[in-house]
Amino acid sequence: MRKVKPARKLGRTTAHRKATLSNLSTQLLIHKRIETTEAKAKETRKVVEKIITKARKGTHHAQREIFSALRNKEAVQELFEEIVGRIGSRNGGYTRIIKLAPRFGDAAKMAVIELVDFAEAPAAASTAAKQDRAKRVKGSKKAETEKEGGESAE
């Protein structure tokens, strides 16, 4: 006998769950990367993958169907103008989920969901953050050498 595996309910009523997933999908399409709980990220991935696949058709009917799901003109416009152009040749797998450390307040499993072709280089961002931190930390060797170098240049 066929058993249907239910989707995650996320502790919400049906209408609230649909609204939550619609909002998360809209924000992902606009910002290309969002941080949320792991369960919400996995459910959002299902919705966004179907939306992008539908958008690749490029028809007016597909645009109307996507707007009925998202209810945000900015997100639909971004999807059809920018995202489909960059993802056009990819057959599925448009999103990536990266697991993060648990949230401090309630230890919920956290994750980042992002569009694959829009991922920024995380190494460059972390290097810049380390340099900024070294400048702020008092007594660090980097901060002292920069301070000495800066004073002699004046």
Curated annotation (Swiss-Prot):
Entry superkingdom: Bacteria
Basic and acidic residues bias: start-end ranges: 141-154
Spans annotated as Disordered: 127-154
Recorded GO CC terms: cytosolic large ribosomal subunit
SUPFAM superfamilies in the cross-refs: Prokaryotic ribosomal protein L17
InterPro entries registered for this protein in UniProt: Ribosomal_bL17, Ribosomal_bL17_CS, Ribosomal_bL17_sf
GO annotation, biological process: translation
Entry keywords, A to Z: Ribonucleoprotein, Ribosomal protein
GO molecular function, one term: structural constituent of ribosome
Family named by the database record: Belongs to the bacterial ribosomal protein bL17 family.
Subunit architecture: Part of the 50S ribosomal subunit. Contacts protein L32.
Name used for this protein in its record: Large ribosomal subunit protein bL17
Biological classification of the source: Bacteria, Pseudomonadati, Chlorobiota, Chlorobiia, Chlorobiales
